[in-house]
Design a protein with these regions (language model features):
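Post-transcriptional modification and biogenesis factors for structured RNAs
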Residues: 1-202
Length: 202
């Protein structure tokens, strides 16, 4: 009962989502360290394919924060533009930090639900924009869905790596099997109070 989560094999949770069909796409990233942190976030959540638009190679600054995720950087795919980066994908979702008049913007949870509506074998791309300017309207038109991550009005945008991590974790969390634990019925409240008195007296 209480120890159900401890008894459930880790593999059952982490392998419930076919991550190989997902591509994480960074459009014109500005900061090399952020790229390394994105790779680390991908490694933490089990995703492996990274595509980059507007870059031709990595600098050393990208490898330092990647730690054990350097293999993701070494296998990264470099693309000249966003249409090239998404050409082979069936479903594309793009992240934005603000509301856009030209687009219907949904929440990250709604975005994950959209993904789950489609067959589990299709190829999915998650697109993140430049740290300073985000994605342009032209770039957003490449997406089937545009989503945002709720945030405080005091700090209206997430760091690139944080946005990627939250997105991937949301996918991870919503794809895990539901754990239904049948707990033993609690004692009547009067008996609970009596037990607490006995424990306190020891």
């Amino acid at each position: 009962g209480y120890n159900l989560i401890m008894k459930l094999p880790y593999k059952t949770i982490s392998d419930s989502l076919n991550r190989s069909r997902f591509s994480i796409i960074l459009a014109n990233p500005q900061n090399q360290e952020n790229i390394g942190l994105v790779a680390r976030a991908m490694k933490n959540t089990g995703f492996s394919e990274l595509r980059l638009v507007g870059l031709q190679e990595f600098e050393q600054e990208a490898y330092r924060p990647a730690v054990h995720a350097r293999d993701i950087l070494k296998k990264a795919i470099f693309c000249q533009n966003l249409p090239e980066a998404v050409a082979d994908l069936n479903l594309v979702l793009a992240s934005t930090a603000r509301q856009r008049k030209a687009f219907q913007v949904i929440t990250i949870d709604q975005a994950v639900e959209k993904i789950r509506l489609f067959p589990s074998h299709i190829k999915v791309g998650l697109v993140f924009g430049n740290e300073r300017t985000g994605l342009s309207d032209i770039e957003l038109r490449q997406a089937n869905f545009v989503y945002f991550i709720p945030q405080s009005s005091r700090q209206p945008s997430y760091n690139l790596a944080a946005a990627v991590l939250i997105t991937l974790y949301t996918l991870f969390r919503q794809s895990a099997p539901e754990l239904v634990a049948e707990l033993p019925p609690p004692l009547p409240h009067k008996e609970q109070a009596g037990c607490l008195q006995i424990i306190s007296a020891k």
